[in-house]
Curated annotation (Swiss-Prot):
Any one Gene Ontology molecular-function term assigned to this protein's record: protein transmembrane transporter activity
Source organism: Mycobacterium leprae (strain TN)
The keyword Transmembrane appears for this protein: yes
GO biological process, any: protein transport by the Sec complex
Function: Essential subunit of the Sec protein translocation channel SecYEG. Clamps together the 2 halves of SecY. May contact the channel plug during translocation.
Family per similarity comment: Belongs to the SecE/SEC61-gamma family.
Name used for this protein in its record: Protein translocase subunit SecE
Biased composition (Polar residues): 45-54
Pfam families cross-referenced by the UniProt entry: SecE
Gene of this entry: secE
Stretches with biased composition (Gly residues): 10-20
Domain of life of the organism encoding this protein: Bacteria
Bilayer topology: Single-pass membrane protein
UniProt KW Protein transport keyword: yes
PANTHER family: PROTEIN TRANSLOCASE SUBUNIT SECE (PTHR33910:SF1)
Length: 146
């Protein structure tokens, strides 16, 4: 959803000038990072990601060239400490789950009411459809087999 729709209600998003003949002008505030994710990618973050991607490729190619010069490929050793303690594994897993749940964009009250009413209306329609089909087939069976 677009944030411009809600900007007029909070008083900071759109302003109508006296000589604009009813056209609106969108006034944006300086880019600040929101407290919670909004679901939109910021331009600054996208630009940083493209710059770091180029740096990583350069580093990888230089590392591969150094390994090719040596002629030996060393395999990294797996640490035995990672799988040793299942309690630490569960703790880390739950910590990651909480971190991912914080990234989720939760619906507001209006969206929840809309989604709930749509689901309940669909449920009522399907119950009526199945009920009528059952009733009709029961009557048909009674007519055929008497």
């Amino acid at each position: 959803m677009s944030d411009e729709r809600y900007a007029a209600s909070d008083g900071g998003g759109t302003e109508v000038g006296s000589g604009t003949r009813g056209r609106t002008t969108v006034v944006t505030k300086p880019a600040t990072r929101p407290q919670r994710p909004t679901g939109k990618r910021s331009r600054q973050r996208a630009a940083n990601a493209s710059n770091t991607g180029a740096n990583v490729e350069v580093e990888e190619s230089s590392t591969q060239a150094a390994i090719a010069k040596e002629g030996k490929v060393k395999k990294p050793k797996k640490s035995a400490d990672r799988s040793a303690n299942p309690i630490v594994f569960i703790y880390n897993y739950l910590k990651q789950v909480v971190g991912e749940m914080r990234k989720v964009i939760w619906p507001n009250r209006k969206q929840m009411l809309t989604y709930t009413s749509v689901v309940l209306a669909f449920l009522a329609f399907m119950v009526a459809l199945v009920g009528l089909a059952d009733f009709g087939l029961a009557k048909l069976v009674l007519l055929v087999f008497g």
